[in-house]
């Protein structure tokens, strides 16, 4: 009788790494995977996103093997790049740090559609606008606050 060892998931980790530049380090060591093999595969799959922040979900198994899923770059990073700023406002209610066009925001919304919980680009655009508002950014021609149907 042949016994086959069943793989068990030991950990699921969510990390943000730089595309094409992952290196073995403490963040990966804690996941418990073959770091050299992971960095080789990750860098190969993200070479077209060189220098961008790439969220990754790593599923580690008891035999040190792994699976990983790449996500799209975080909205905050995309907004900062579009507005050409280093960071958001310390107090976004009173301080505005920049402005981007509706076209740039729509481009971000279309890029992020796969990872957002939105049915269409208009809903995704409102989510992007909400994030921008929390960072102290304005999107020309877009109001992040929409009227709710409740209590109207």
From Swiss-Prot:
Origin organism lineage: Bacteria, Bacillati, Mycoplasmatota, Mycoplasmoidales, Mycoplasmoidaceae
Role played: Forms part of the ribosomal stalk which helps the ribosome interact with GTP-bound translation factors.
Gene Ontology cellular component annotations, sorted alphabetically: cytosolic large ribosomal subunit
Name assigned to this protein: Large ribosomal subunit protein uL11
Family to which the UniProt record says this protein belongs: Belongs to the universal ribosomal protein uL11 family.
Record key words, sorted: Methylation, Ribonucleoprotein, Ribosomal protein, RNA-binding, rRNA-binding
Oligomer and partners: Part of the ribosomal stalk of the 50S ribosomal subunit. Interacts with L10 and the large rRNA to form the base of the stalk. L10 forms an elongated spine to which L12 dimers bind in a sequential fashion forming a multimeric L10(L12)X complex.
Modification note: One or more lysine residues are methylated.
Pfam families: Ribosomal_L11 (PF00298), Ribosomal_L11_N (PF03946)
GO molecular function: large ribosomal subunit rRNA binding; structural constituent of ribosome
One GO term of the biological process aspect: translation
């Amino acid at each position: 009788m042949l016994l086959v060892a069943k793989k068990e998931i030991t950990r699921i980790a969510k990390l943000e790494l730089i595309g094409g530049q992952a290196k073995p380090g403490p963040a990966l060591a804690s996941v418990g995977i073959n770091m050299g093999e992971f960095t080789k595969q990750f860098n190969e799959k993200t070479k077209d996103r060189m220098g961008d922040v790439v969220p990754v979900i790593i599923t580690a198994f008891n035999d040190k093997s792994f699976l990983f899923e790449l996500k799209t770059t975080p909205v905050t990073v995309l907004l900062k790049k579009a507005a050409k700023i280093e960071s958001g406002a310390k107090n976004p209610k009173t301080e505005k740090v920049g402005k981007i066009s509706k076209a740039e925001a729509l481009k971000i919304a279309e890029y992020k559609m796969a990872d957002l919980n939105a049915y269409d680009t208009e809903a995704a655009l409102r989510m992007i606008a909400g994030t921008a508002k929390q960072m102290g950014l304005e999107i020309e021609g877009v109001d992040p606050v929409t009227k709710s149907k409740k209590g109207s």
